[in-house]
Amino acid sequence: MSVELAKVSILGKECVHVGYQIHEHIVKSTLEHCKSSTYVIINDTNVSKVPYYHDLVSLFEKSLPEGSRLLRYDVKPGEAHKSRETKADIEDYLLLEGCTRDTVIIAVGGGVIGDMIGFVASTFMRGVRVIQVPTSLLAMVDSSIGGKTAVDTPLGKNFVGAFWQPQFVFVDIKWLETLPQREFINGIAEVIKTACIWNGEEFARLEANAETFLSVVNNSQTVSVFSPHHNETVELTYTNIESMLEHTYKLVLESIKVKAHVVSSDERESGLRNLLNFGHTIGHAYEAILTPQALHGECVSIGMVKEAELSRYMNILSATQVARMVKILAAYGLPISVNEKWFKELTLNKKTPLDVLLKKMSIDKKNDGSKKKVVILEKIGKCYGTSAHVVSDEDLRFVLSDETLVHPFNNIPEGQNKVITPPGSKSISNRALILAALGKGTCKIKNLLHSDDTKHMLNAVQQLKGATISWEDDGETVVVHGQGGSTLTAPSEALYLGNAGTASRFLTTVAALAKKDGKNDHVILTGNARMQERPIGPLVDSLRSNGLKIDYLNRQGSLPLKINTETNFKGGKIELAATVSSQYVSSILMCAPYAEEPVTLSLIGGKPISQLYVDMTIKMMDAFGIKVTTSTTEPFTYHIPKGNYINPAEYTIESDASSATYPLSFAAITGTTVTVPNIGSASLQGDARFAVDVLRPMGCEVTQTATSTTVTGPPRGQLKPLKHVDMEPMTDAFLTASVVAAICNNGTTNTTTIEGIANQRVKECNRIEAMVTQLAKFGVRANELPDGIQIHGVNSISELRQPSDAGIETYDDHRVAMSFSLLAGMVNSDKKDDESSVRILERQCTGKTWPGWWDVLHSQLGARLDGAEPSTTKSSEVKKSVVIIGMRAAGKSTVSKWCAESLGYRLLDLDEEFERQYGKGTVKDFVAESGWDEFRKEETRIFQEAVDKYGDKGYVLSSGGGIVERSESRQALKRFAESGGIVLHLHRDIEETIVFLKSDPTRPAYIEEIRDVWERREKWYHECSNFTFFAAHCSNEIEFRNLRHVFSNFIRRVLGAEKIPVPSRRSAFVCLTFEDLSDHLSKLDEITYGCEAVELRVDHLSSFSSDFVTKQISLLRAATKSLPIVFTVRTVSQGGKFQDDDYDLLESLLKVALKNAVEYIDLELTLPNNILYNVLNKKSNTKIIGSHHDFAAKFPWDDAEWENRYNQALSLDVDIVKFVGTAVSFDDNLALEKFRSTHTLKPLIAINMTETGKLSRVLNNILTPVTSKLLPSAAAPGQLTLAEINQLYHQIGGLPAKKFFVIGSPIGHSRSPILHNTGYELLGLPHHFDKFETEDIEVVKKELLTREDLGGLAVTIPLKLDIIDSMFELSEAAKTIGAVNTVIPLGKNKFRGDNTDWLGIKNSLVSNGVPSSVSGSAGLIIGAGGTSRAAIYALKQIGCDTIYMLNRTTEKLQKLKSEFSEEYKIVVVESAEQTESIKEQVSVAVSCVPADKPLDPELLNKLERLLAKGTNSSFKPTLLDAAYKPSVTPIMKLARDKFNWNIVPGAEMLVHQGVEQFSKWTGAKPPFKAIFDAVTQE
């Protein structure tokens, strides 16, 4: 196949040549027209892998004339190398090769190469000739045309460059064959852009060919080819360009023509050329945030939609044109919103804050100073004016946000008179599409509503092959080519209908007419979450009774539906309950002519709802050739004959009468005039009566002809309430009437009563309830009636209340949003200069029926609008609750209490809530009386109510074991998890559970074996939960406390209450390669000494079952005190043991990791994209390490492989990059360090394996993989212990030896030296800790604070206060406690004073079973000395509500209390009698009195009374004695023996405060157990 070679002129020269397979033409033209001694082909290493590149180079070499030479230069790929440094490297190469001014440079590549090499050519030898050979679609149509060249700088893209026109641009379509699919689609954005601004005909051609294009590109394949340049087989994408060659050639050529024309008219971008930036002002702002995950064209696509919406908002571009643009971008596979699910996943759910977008937009070359300029469209193919226009931040904010601020309508002039034409009726549009699709012949439908609903309907009609659709009149007319229903067939994919209720009901019956297509023997209708709650049951029941097989795939009575195509629509007598929705009636009516027999449709259950809509359907069927007759003998019965619709040549949709109520009501409330020119008394729609039946009685002047309606409102504040109005003929309009009624008051009454609207409870939301709820925010009282609403209007407009910043909920309901947009503007509208505003949420939902409503309200009716980010008030109030599920006896009740205490949440036990509501006994009693099935139904109801009420309010909901038994409960659990809630599966070993349950008589008995119950439920627990915690069996109190501690850390990390930051200093993790950790638990603590994390090599485990792996994670956490886990499944090709291609098992293991909330997942960058993105989008608070290993020593550190993988890691936005090479020579370590120094955008772990590579491990900065002497072998060649790394680092000068001292007097018995020196020795640190005894601070200043090798000071009495004056800064703890026990050098003779005594107290308590948050409990402190101050601070930090203090004398305590703020809630206990009034649980105590003196009897009496108040604590009450000799003090003995308190010796406090010092000084993680043992041994 071939196409003709086209030549396009730029600046008077035919220099752009476009064709297919034009290598010979490229070489011939270059050698003929650009004679030179030296030709240099410059490309990136990705292009040099393509065989077509080698064909070009080979042909060039063969064709060179004598005396000429060809040089080639490869650069590293990617935007990161479009830099001044790369440019300099290229120039140095050219100079070294002796290139002179006659050199011709040929740039072969995408936009990065074209831009950069063009800039090289413009400056080398003050300018040499350049030829562009673009290889990507984006480069072909954009960057290669026009002579703009540049490189990036750290401050921005393309900031340094020049205009330098190429001699030729050779555009060879053949290059696109190997362009990756996403890059291909990325380039299409620029093609569509040029058609939008200049070429309407080409836009229409692009529309017509979209399906073919996307089909070809999406079916591209990966092929293996040999690359001579790389001497290896490489994988490339192959797209069958020849199958759409004419279309591709044309789209490239036409796009180039537009840009060439514009460039020729305005080469230096002074005016016309900036039209080429349509979509780029906003698109570039998105790109700046979303790069590198999002591509340029993807962001420009979103930018085009936003800038088109801005044009519509300014009343310049029609809604139809915007709809066409949105449709074509989506049709070519481009994103149209940052909120599209696939695009959000691709960009890893990055946020695009409004203020950041505006800031990015302010840095744009089109701007006029601080004024932002945007290209405005007039219509498809034509811009508004000849350059970009200045737009306000206010308008930009509106377009960019989904929340609207409506300012008071105090700017609307009296006497304003407007003509507003609402879009086509949704009801008529949807019916017309169904009738035309079922009809025979071509029908041109005019004024069709372009909305989400009709978009879904059009797509569905085409998917069902019911008709072909085309467009005329710039998209204003839809042309339906109907086939009389004969071609309806089942599609291979589900019909997605969003929240389009009308479409779902009409299409249910249409789908029943479809025939089987090959293997496709059913049609699935589905929609969004709200659509899957809306009712469709009566229609389905009716169709089922007529012989059709229809299944619900989720909840009964709602979508999704599965409609079998092998059963037929029989017809005959059909009965239908029509008291809920008239759309059920219309659905059967419209499809009835295609039943096997004539249909008699009887509506049962009472008077049908919305009769006027049924009449509308019948009248429209008549217009399409089928006459329905109403029975004269049976009520609400219709006879429909068999037949085919005959499509009228043209059908015009009248405007939507429901939508017309909004501008007409605007006139009513503002005292102005509005005319709707195409809705009058002859309308098919019941809502056309709104002005006459509602607004006129309210006091408006109404003029209505057969085809138009005009409303003039009375002076503001003079509308009258309606005593009663039946809105059954126009139910959708009740919302508009309600907001108008909110400001109605005739002086004697203010109550409006609306009835006949019961069906509004099952629309997009329960609209009656929504209206009552939201009106209340304006201070308007309303109440529900059985089939209506009563509104009690305010006495005057000035009484309308300003809603809070949380805003007005719209419930994703277009009519709620539009109605409240009117009332919002009336708030403060009586105050002339008031700038307040009312926030309306989810404004985009108006796209369902009137996408341009806000534009009309703003640009035509004159309202002032602004946009806003979602309110922080609202998001800060949301505390996602935790639902705990699991088998009976898994420990849910206990763990739920732990959970609530750890998070500061409230606890609701759902079984207890059931018993409270039941009121007649226990669950066991109810089951005995009513059976399990009834209990399960009630359980579901109570759970759903609890989630609705408490789901965002910080609750722990503890469920019964069988909550997963009912499908409805499972769906509710899944929905809660999908909405961001935590559904935690608490799991225990099933064997232990069985033993326990068999011995517990208090629970209702299972009617089957416990193991069978578990096997049935197991999969449900897994599928309903988004997190899992395995609670190991505890055989003693210590294990139980440890489990609580581990769980507390786990749940706080899940909720983000405890963050695990990526280390910013030297750190390590130890690698475990055991088959089963349970055999090595006693050694794990010591193995992990000094490490910030521990790697679980899952590929080495003996089993990959999810249960086994979950247990291993649990064991590891318990044994290492919740040390962060690196979860690694290393594949064989990356040096591990896991099979390379077992992706299903790998995905299941990664899912286990995510559900167990491991702190890190090592994700190999060679894995398929779908696995990578799946993990990245579900990672929650888990950090991702993107890793790549080169075991074969195939890639030196300057190879493009590492660069490509680094760019890949950046695009995936992993948290840490981990690269492991293999050192062959010592120089490989130096090459690695050079790579490390230039790759600093992400934390980087970079090491070399083998003995030769050990230096790289020593020099690595963060999370270096290490081994331990206690492990049988290292996990990788050359791996070192942490101590070895530190010793080597010291020896090469990286870790200078420091001196540390404890200062004060007396310190002869101080354990600090042994504490710290033990840690230094174990971790291989070169430091030494000694005693320095003195009482004189001046000696300390002179002899210690001046030492250059000083690492830190531990300060004890009497210097804790004296040292403060020598400190440059103090920590918050030191300031509050008023003492310093830790001195940290800051450099330059400056020091920071800190206090770790409080951490010694806090961590001693927490490590002995006290929750990290004890909210609801009180604390107790005995003593008034210096340690008491630290104790006060510590107890406040763990959340004690009140702190009680005891001492022999209270004077010191009163002074101490006065030195702390009231928020500490310190209560000095003066007498024993005072303790009687204390009602709180006293659960935590710290003794700060000497242990070598007997306690005062009165103090002892008060102490005993307070210790007695710990008996009902939710955790075991715990006392710490700060004295560490003797090991059990008298107070400890009293608390333990008499009051059953848990006791903690002072030695633990000593060690805990000491290891905190150790960590602050060295940055290393101290080996706690070894230090503790060393300190406490006598």
UniProtKB/Swiss-Prot annotation:
The keyword Kinase applies. One of its GO terms (biological process) is chorismate biosynthetic process. Zn(2+) binds at E190, H280, H296. Residues 1297-1578 are annotated as: Shikimate dehydrogenase. Residues 1072-1284 are annotated as: 3-dehydroquinase. One of its GO terms (cellular component) is cytoplasm. Transmembrane segments: none annotated. Keywords: Amino-acid biosynthesis, Aromatic amino acid biosynthesis, ATP-binding, Cytoplasm, Kinase, Lyase, Metal-binding, Multifunctional enzyme, NADP, Nucleotide-binding, Oxidoreductase, Transferase, Zinc. GO terms for molecular function: 3-dehydroquinate dehydratase activity; 3-dehydroquinate synthase activity; 3-phosphoshikimate 1-carboxyvinyltransferase activity; ATP binding; metal ion binding; shikimate 3-dehydrogenase (NADP+) activity; shikimate kinase activity. ATP binds at G886, M887, R888, A889, A890, G891, K892, S893. Binds 2 Zn(2+) ions per subunit. Residues 406-863 are annotated as: EPSP synthase. It is found in: Cytoplasm. The active site is at E269, H284, C845, H1189, K1218. Pathway: Metabolic intermediate biosynthesis; chorismate biosynthesis; chorismate from D-erythrose 4-phosphate and phosphoenolpyruvate: step 2/7; Metabolic intermediate biosynthesis; chorismate biosynthesis; chorismate from D-erythrose 4-phosphate and phosphoenolpyruvate: step 3/7; Metabolic intermediate biosynthesis; chorismate biosynthesis; chorismate from D-erythrose 4-phosphate and phosphoenolpyruvate: step 4/7; Metabolic intermediate biosynthesis; chorismate biosynthesis; chorismate from D-erythrose 4-phosphate and phosphoenolpyruvate: step 5/7. Its EC number is 4.2.3.4, 2.5.1.19, 2.7.1.71, 4.2.1.10. NAD(+) binds at residues 44-46, 79-82, 110-112, 115, 135-136, 157, 175-178, 186. Residues 882-1071 are annotated as: Shikimate kinase. Its cofactor is Zn(2+). The AROM polypeptide catalyzes 5 consecutive enzymatic reactions in prechorismate polyaromatic amino acid biosynthesis. In the N-terminal section; belongs to the sugar phosphate cyclases superfamily. Dehydroquinate synthase family. This is Pentafunctional AROM polypeptide.
